Every structure is written in C-alpha cells, then in structure tokens.
C-alpha cells in the first residue's frame, strides 16, 4: 500500500463517506464511539492485528462495559478498517475475536405485577398530558423517544391504533461539541409499526385529547417532550407512589414480560415491540422457570405414550 494512512485519518474519510448514507443520529453515535473508545487506542496505528483487537476487547469487557456494547464498538472499528482496505489505504485481515463469557444473565428490569397495578390505577385515574406517556409505554412497549415524538395525527381513534414512525432524542454532536435534539425515523425498519390500542389506553387518550392544545400526545408544549426531562418526571412519579426505582425503559420490558406471561405468541410480541427478529425477543424475555421446564418434559413424555 503506497498511500498508507493512520486509523484516525481513515476514520475521518469513513465518516465523510457515511454522512449522506446514514441518519444524522447514527453518524453522531459513530463519531462518539470513535472519539471515546477507538481513537485513544488505535488513532496513530497504521496496522491493527487480531491480537491488538483481542486485547482491546478483553480490556473493555474487564473495565465493566457490557459485551454487547463492546461488540458494537468493534463493529465500528471493523467497518472503518474494511473501508480503508477496500480503498487501499489500510491493511485488513479477517479476525476471529473471542468475547469473555458473562458470569450472569441479568433479566431486564421490570415492575412487579403489584407495582404495575398501582401505577396503572394512578395513571388511569389521572389521565393528564404528563401521565399519558407513562401509560403509553406500559400498554404498548414504545421506547421513550417514540413516546415523546408521538403526535395526535399518529393516533387513529377510529381504527384504535397507533402508528409509530418518529423518535426524538438528544444526542452529542462531536463536531459541534454540544448536544442537539434530533427527530428521526425509529431505531430500525421494523420499529416503524402499527400498534393496537387497549380499551383502558383508548379511554385515557380520548380524555387527554380533549384538554390538549399540543400537536404532541405527551406534554402541553408546541415542541415534543425532552426524553431526559420525561425520565426525571417518571422517577419522581414512582417516588410519589412509593414504587421502587425503575428506568423508563423498564416499562417496555414490563410490557413485554406481561405479554409473554399471558402466553401471547412470540412473533406477535416481537412485531409490537419493533424488534428486528424474534430471536431478540426470545433472548430478552423468554426465561422458563423450573415448573415450566417440568411441564415441557411431562408433555413430551405423555406424547410418546410409553407407560
């Protein structure tokens, strides 16, 4: 390679190539990953070996980062280097990277059934422009960015459905060195979806619609709610109701968990959540307990018909 460049130089060219292709929020995420994790380690490198990447992975995992987070970082690293290799400015050979096994498989944080009932009773008794977003997340599994970006025009009262087609988030722009609010399409193509509205949620939405002057379902402003400030509101609400702390995304986990517990089929739950595939839903929410395993074995034994 006559025109060899450093990883830092290649990453800048790669970002420029990605700019017209990916969402602005995605590009900002790439740049933040590069700035925070990759450039400090590999910025000056003109060659990155499998051994280098393997040690990087071990260091990141042992520092406390989740294995999925480290995989995502390595995916950006690989994409930059492969781009450099394609254009003859950086050498690349395929890696076989091993990731340290996780010692425990943590279940997603959820509300207990009792705490969910307490919260839902409060939300249904007081359907306000502030409370409705929490109820939306509990009854549909929508992400906080989708909840805050939801407009009344996306709620079909006649068909009793919600169309999820936007999300809002405040992201860090590495070029501006400041945060900015970004509206965009949802996380993946599967995230653009239609969700049926339950009877309880429909009634609450109608009551909020009567008093709302905002184009957005959540809040009273002409602009959407900031996800960060809405998380703070949710935290205060839980404290007021004497419910243990839960991150807002735990409402999505709670919705999915209750769907699985009530024996909804996995494919339908996956589509409602906007997951890219059923495997994501299964890995996150389907964790059979011992009694369920015993019933499975008993059914199989009975099916054989051998006494």
Tell what function each PLM region has.
Residues 68, 86, 135, 139-146, ...:
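C-terminal catalytic core of tyrosine-transesterase DNA break-rejoin enzymes
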Residues 3-8, 15-83, 87-89, 105, ...:
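N-terminal core-binding DNA-recognition domain of tyrosine site-specific recombinases/integrases
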Residues 84-94, 157, 166-174, 207-214, ...:
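Proline-centered turn/helix-capping motifs that create local helix->coil transitions or kinks
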Residues 67, 71, 86, 90-91, ...:
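Basic, Lys/Arg- and aromatic-enriched nucleic-acid-binding interface segment
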Residues 159, 170-174, 178-192, 199-201, ...:
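C-terminal secondary-structure termini that scaffold catalytic or DNA-interacting sites
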Residues 50, 58, 113, 121, ...:
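Phosphate-coordinating loops and pocket residues in cytosolic domains that bind phosphorylated ligands
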Residues 32, 196-244:
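Active-site/catalytic core of tyrosine-dependent DNA strand-transfer enzymes
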């Amino acid at each position: 390679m006559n025109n060899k460049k450093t990883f830092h130089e290649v990453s800048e060219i790669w970002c420029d190539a990605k700019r017209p292709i990916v969402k602005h929020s995605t590009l900002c995420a790439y740049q933040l990953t590069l700035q925070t994790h990759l450039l400090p380690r590999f910025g000056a490198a003109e060659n990155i070996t499998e051994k280098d990447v393997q040690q990087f992975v071990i260091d990141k995992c042992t520092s406390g980062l989740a294995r999925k987070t480290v995989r995502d970082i390595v995916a950006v690293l690989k994409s930059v280097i492969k781009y450099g290799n394609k254009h003859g400015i950086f050498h690349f050979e395929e890696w076989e990277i091993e990731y340290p096994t996780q010692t425990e498989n943590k279940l997603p944080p959820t509300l207990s059934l009792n705490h969910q009932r307490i919260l839902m009773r409060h939300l249904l008794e007081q359907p306000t422009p502030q409370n409705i977003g929490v109820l939306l997340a509990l009854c549909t599994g929508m992400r906080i960015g989708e909840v805050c970006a939801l407009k009344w025009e996306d709620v079909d009262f006649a068909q009793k459905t919600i169309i999820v087609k936007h999300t809002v988030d405040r992201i860090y722009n590495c070029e501006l060195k400041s945060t900015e609010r970004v509206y965009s399409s949802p996380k993946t193509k599967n995230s653009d979806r239609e969700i049926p509205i339950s009877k309880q949620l429909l009634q609450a939405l109608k009551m909020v619609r009567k008093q709302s002057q905002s184009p957005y379902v959540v809040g009273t402003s002409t602009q959407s709610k900031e996800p960060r400030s809405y998380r703070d509101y949710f935290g205060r609400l839980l404290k007021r109701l004497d419910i243990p702390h839960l991150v807002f995304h735990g409402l999505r986990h709670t919705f999915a968990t209750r769907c699985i517990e009530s024996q909804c089929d996995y494919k339908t739950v996956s589509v409602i959540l906007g997951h890219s595939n059923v495997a994501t839903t299964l890995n996150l929410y389907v964790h059979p307990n011992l009694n369920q395993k015993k019933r499975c074995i008993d059914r199989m034994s009975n099916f054989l018909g051998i006494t």
